[in-house]
Curated annotation (Swiss-Prot):
Species of origin: Mus musculus
Record key words, sorted: Cell adhesion, Cell membrane, Coiled coil, Disulfide bond, Glycoprotein, Immunity, Inflammatory response, Lectin, Lipoprotein, Membrane, Palmitate, Receptor, Repeat, Secreted, Signal-anchor, Transmembrane, Transmembrane helix
Protein name (database record): Oxidized low-density lipoprotein receptor 1
Purpose: Receptor that mediates the recognition, internalization and degradation of oxidatively modified low density lipoprotein (oxLDL) by vascular endothelial cells. OxLDL is a marker of atherosclerosis that induces vascular endothelial cell activation and dysfunction, resulting in pro-inflammatory responses, pro-oxidative conditions and apoptosis.
Protein localization: Cell membrane; Membrane raft; Secreted
Primary location class: membrane
GO BP annotations listed: cell adhesion; immune system process; inflammatory response
CDD domains cross-referenced by the UniProt entry: CLECT_NK_receptors_like
Amino acid composition bias (Basic and acidic residues), ranges on this chain: 1-18
Ranges annotated as spanning the membrane: 32-54
Region entry Neck, spans: 55-241
Comment text on domains: The cytoplasmic region is required for subcellular sorting on the cell surface. The C-type lectin domain mediates the recognition and binding of oxLDL.
SMART domains per UniProt: CLECT (SM00034)
Taxonomic placement: Eukaryota, Metazoa, Chordata, Craniata, Vertebrata
Length: 363
């Protein structure tokens, strides 16, 4: 045995133990069942892959649906939160509105009570006015009947005068014709006829003048009858009538503002000239305790009390009470209340009584 032979690897030598035996791997490949098993395994892998793909796709769809559902929930939460805020705001607004409405109700209730009181006063004034209008209506009807009788009489006289004038005109015409026929007659006859013509002409002129006067009287009476038909009474609407004066209760304003209002209505603040006037006014305001300015004032303490027209106060009818000794820049002004006359600062607010002369029907 050479050195090279000794150096050969031991595995080059045949394995005695493996002689006569086939390898196990080769034995499996040579088995008739390995191909169907492999195909089955491949199919299972494909099915599993497809299933995984489908499941993954469905999972993505479910994930998208969950995201959309989450977004919808978020949106609904925002909407719900907005609704809750709006409801809270509405409740707060409702509370404020309730408070505001309650305040308005209280104010309206107070105004309603004031209006009810004013309505009672207006009802009394309306009753007094209706009585005054009834008296004026009775007076107006009598005046109209009287005027109608006068107009009928004048119209009848006018017709008579017109008839007389026509007769005179006819006589003049006849005389002129006779004068024309007698133009060739004697001068004496002409003078006689001319004298008669002059006399008749003079009478005609007198009758014409009387007729014009009657026409003017007729026109004046017709105008008076028209005024009587339109005459609603000696006092304007809402004014009270007492003897020769009309009275209006209005306000409330300061003394100066009431004075200006009375002047704009053609009158002045109340001036009491007699006990009868004072009794009427006190009776007219006996249903209320409100103060009423009258046209009596003075500039400074110690100076005389003067009416609006400058005449001094006659203490025979009444005296002022509760006169303040304090000096006001606007002076002291008098007012009626509870049947007495008081004096106070002229800038205070009170009702007033306007006064003006009655407007009698002129015939």
């Amino acid at each position: 045995m050479t050195f090279d032979d000794k150096m050969k690897p031991a595995n080059d030598e045949p394995d005695q133990k493996s002689c006569g035996k086939k390898p196990k791997g080769l034995h499996l490949l040579s088995s008739p069942w390995w191909f169907p098993a492999a195909m089955t395994l491949v199919i299972l892998c494909l099915v599993l892959s497809v299933t995984l793909i489908v499941q993954w796709t469905q999972l993505r769809q479910v994930s998208d649906l969950l995201k959309q559902y989450q977004a919808n929930l978020t949106q609904q939460d925002r909407i719900l939160e907005g609704q809750m805020l709006a409801q809270q705001k509405a409740e707060n607004t409702s509370q404020e509105s309730k408070k505001e409405l309650k305040g308005k109700i209280d104010t309206l209730t107070q105004k309603l009570n004031e209006k009810s009181k004013e309505q009672e006063e207006l009802l009394q004034k309306n009753q007094n006015l209706q009585e005054a209008l009834q008296r004026a209506a009775n007076s107006s009807e009598e005046s109209q009947r009287e005027l109608k009788g006068k107009i009928d009489t004048i119209t009848r006289k006018l017709d008579e005068k017109s008839k007389e004038q026509e007769e005179l005109l006819q006589m003049i015409q006849n005389l002129q014709e006779a004068l024309q026929r007698a133009a060739n007659s004697s001068e004496e006859s002409q003078r006689e006829l001319k004298g008669k013509i002059d006399t008749l002409t003079l009478k005609l002129n007198e009758k014409s003048k009387e007729q014009e006067e009657l026409l003017q009287k007729n026109q004046n009476l017709q105008e008076a009858l028209q005024r009587a038909a339109n005459f609603s009474g000696p006092c304007p609407q809402d004014w009270l009538w007492h003897k020769e004066n009309c009275y209006l209760f209005h306000g409330p304003f300061s003394w100066e503002k009431n004075r200006q209002t009375c002047q704009s209505l053609g009158g002045q603040l109340l001036q009491i000239n007699g006990a009868d006037d004072l009794t009427f006014i006190l009776q007219a305001i006996s249903h209320t305790t409100s103060p009423f300015w009258i046209g009596l004032h003075r500039k400074k303490p110690g100076q005389p009390w003067l009416w609006e027209n400058g005449t001094p106060l006659n203490f025979q009818f009444f005296k002022t009470r509760g006169v303040s000794l304090q000096l006001y820049s606007s002076g002291n002004c008098a007012y009626l209340q509870d049947g007495a006359v008081f004096a106070e600062n002229c800038i205070l607010i009170a009702f007033s009584i306007c006064q003006k002369k009655t407007n009698h029907l002129q015939i």
